[in-house]
Curated annotation (Swiss-Prot):
Catalyzes the formation of S-adenosylmethionine (AdoMet) from methionine and ATP. The overall synthetic reaction is composed of two sequential steps, AdoMet formation and the subsequent tripolyphosphate hydrolysis which occurs prior to release of AdoMet from the enzyme. This is S-adenosylmethionine synthase. Binds 2 divalent ions per subunit. Binds 1 potassium ion per subunit. Its EC number is 2.5.1.6. The keyword Cytoplasm applies. SUPFAM superfamilies: S-adenosylmethionine synthetase (SSF55973). Homotetramer; dimer of dimers. The gene is metK.
Length: 385
């Protein structure tokens, strides 16, 4: 008997209010880290109707022009006209940044050159063989749709689109393998002049059928395009946005657990971010090496402590090796202290704006060092000993 089920993941465009906040926070981080690699940054952003507030904590000698940074991000996203509900020129930008507590910093920067974890917490990484980038198919497809919404808007293929938008894909699985797409949901902000009929037809033709892999498409896919019938008011005018509210979109679309810590606006001494990248690096290399077909990796840390307090590997019955053997391999092959992660993944670079929309994982950009599979041979060698 076939084990059959549907699994769903969603993504959002760069013009979604929560993603706007993520991008502003990461732009602030990039500006500072490019000029001060020793900086400690925890930047939170709120966007709402007509204004943006930047808050959080910093420890740096760098002056960051918050207004300029925020306005440039909003402009690049495409909020260039008050008719869109937000305009980079007229929106107020408020700066509420404070200084990092010395009580936190004393546990992070150590005299011996090591780095203690910036907080306690647990982080997860995941990889599987459903796509070439070793990501789950539903989130991979949802990101493709969300990215295409923005690209077709920016290149004027679909000039009636506006920046805010969401996508959702339900995939049909049989015996734990994806076989087809069952349902696609796309909600996109649009100009008031376009008819819903034309919008739906254009989105399906220009985005769905030109972007998604043909092997998963068929005539019976259920489409819901702007199912409420209208989406003119969007962006921060329609909903407030906050940094860190799209943590499942940012990761694996619900295919594995999440420790709860957001990424954007945090420098790599914060293990919420850097250890989640390391956990993906571990999981992806385990799958790429062939020792398993699927891997969930959990790392956990204590504030001010150098070594992780626990490492857990679950291969979902796809490996001939036990969790104990796999964990020994991970400890031998990967550097999982905060300093080891930062150095091995070269994280003290202004790369974070690239991560802040369309997923932190599964995009094999040169800057995304955690997506490299350069540890696969070491893993194979470990199990040949």
């Amino acid at each position: 008997m076939k084990d059959s089920f549907l699994f769903t993941s969603e993504s959002v465009t760069e013009g979604h209010p929560d993603k706007m906040a993520d991008q502003i926070s990461d732009a602030v981080l990039d500006y500072i880290i490019e000029r001060d690699q020793k900086a400690k940054v925890a930047c939170e952003t709120l966007v709402s109707n007509g204004f943006c507030m930047i808050t959080g904590e910093l420890k740096t000698s760098v002056y960051a022009p918050m207004q300029e940074i925020a306005r440039e991000v909003v402009k690049k996203i495409g909020y260039t006209d008050a008719l869109y509900g937000f305009d980079y020129r007229s929106a107020a930008v408020l700066n509420g940044i404070g200084e990092q507590s010395p009580d936190i910093n004393q546990g992070v920067d150590r005299e011996d050159g090591e780095i203690g974890a910036g907080d306690q917490g647990l982080m997860f990484g995941y990889a599987c063989k459903e796509t070439e980038t070793l990501m789950p198919l539903p989130i991979h497809l949802a990101h493709q749709l969300a990215f295409a919404l923005a690209q077709k808007r920016k290149d004027n293929t679909l000039p009636f689109l506006r920046p805010d938008g969401k996508s959702q894909v339900s995939v049909h699985y049989e015996n734990n393998k994806p076989v087809s797409i069952d349902t696609i949901v796309i909600s996109t902000q649009h100009s008031p002049e376009v008819s819903q009929k034309h919008l739906k037809e254009a989105v399906i033709e220009e985005i769905v059928y030109k972007v998604l892999p043909k092997e998963y498409l068929h005539d019976n896919i259920k489409f819901f395009v702007n199912p409420t019938g209208k989406f003119v008011i969007g962006g921060p005018q329609g909903d407030a946005g906050l940094t860190g509210r799209k943590i499942i979109v940012d990761t694996y679309g619900g295919s594995c657990p999440h420790g709860g810590g957001a990424f954007s606006g945090k420098d790599p001494s914060k293990v919420d971010r850097s250890a989640a990248y390391a956990a993906r690096y571990v999981a992806k290399n385990l799958v790429a090496s062939g020792v398993c077909d699927k891997a969930t990796v959990q790392l956990a840390y204590a504030i001010g402590v150098i070594e992780p307090v626990s490492i857990y590997v679950n291969t979902h019955n796809t490996s001939k090796y036990s969790s104990v053997e796999l964990e020994k391999c991970v400890k031998a092959v990967f550097k999982l202290t905060p300093k080891g992660i930062i150095e091995s993944l070269d994280l003290l670079r202004p790369i974070y704006s690239l991560t802040s929309a369309y997923g932190h994982f599964g995009r094999e950009l040169e800057e995304f060092t955690w997506e490299k599979t350069n540890k696969d041979e070491e893993i194979k060698a470990f199990f040949k000993r």
